[in-house]
Amino acid sequence: MSLEEVLKDIERDKEEKKKEIADAASRETAKIEKEREEKIQILQREYENRMREEGSRLYNSIIDKANVEARNIVRMRVQEILDQYGAKADELIKNLAKTKEYDDVLKKMIEVSRKALGPDCIVKVNTADKGRISDGNIKFEDIDPYGGVLATSRDGKIELDLRISSIRRDILERFKVRLYSMIED
């Protein structure tokens, strides 16, 4: 399996997971929106009765407050959804080294490192990954608690950081931004 195929498989799997998470988040957001609308309806009926008693000025003030409160409820729930699904995505990424695909991912990371920095670059992987790689030109050190590759050009001037921890941050940031935009639509 070529590096491009593995990367496409990883990207496809990632996109499928993102879609599943986004679909679940959209359903949850629709439910929240319905609850918000129901709450607004109830609040509006209460406030209409008060308006008759206290006048239109008070009514407008209360409705504005209810809308702000309802928006805050939705914002808080959306944040909870982002946190919840972000945590799930984070766990999937952190546990990549425990999957059967990790061997191929690790080999492709090494290939990418050598292609980018030259065949004589210094490639480091976790000591725990020693049994996964048969290449004798690899240094084994504890570089990252979640796995990956840290490569340096032979002269030490260029470093390619493919450690899971580094990649994870970027993926999660993009995931949360995309999920938030899907929820807002």
Curated annotation (Swiss-Prot):
Presence of keyword Transport: yes
GO MF annotation: an example: proton-transporting ATP synthase activity, rotational mechanism
Cross-referenced NCBIfam families: PRK01194.1
Subcellular location: Cell membrane
Protein name: A-type ATP synthase subunit E
Similarity section: Belongs to the V-ATPase E subunit family.
BP term (GO), one: proton motive force-driven plasma membrane ATP synthesis
Keyword Cell membrane: yes
Mode of membrane association: Peripheral membrane protein
Keywords tagged on the record: ATP synthesis, Cell membrane, Hydrogen ion transport, Ion transport, Membrane, Transport
Assembly, per entry: Has multiple subunits with at least A(3), B(3), C, D, E, F, H, I and proteolipid K(x).
SUPFAM superfamilies for the chain: V-type ATPase subunit E-like
CC annotations in GO: plasma membrane; proton-transporting two-sector ATPase complex, catalytic domain
Database matches in InterPro entries: ATPase_E_C (IPR038495), ATPase_V1_Esu (IPR002842)
Function of the molecule: Component of the A-type ATP synthase that produces ATP from ADP in the presence of a proton gradient across the membrane.
The organism of origin for this protein: Thermoplasma acidophilum (strain ATCC 25905 / DSM 1728 / JCM 9062 / NBRC 15155 / AMRC-C165)
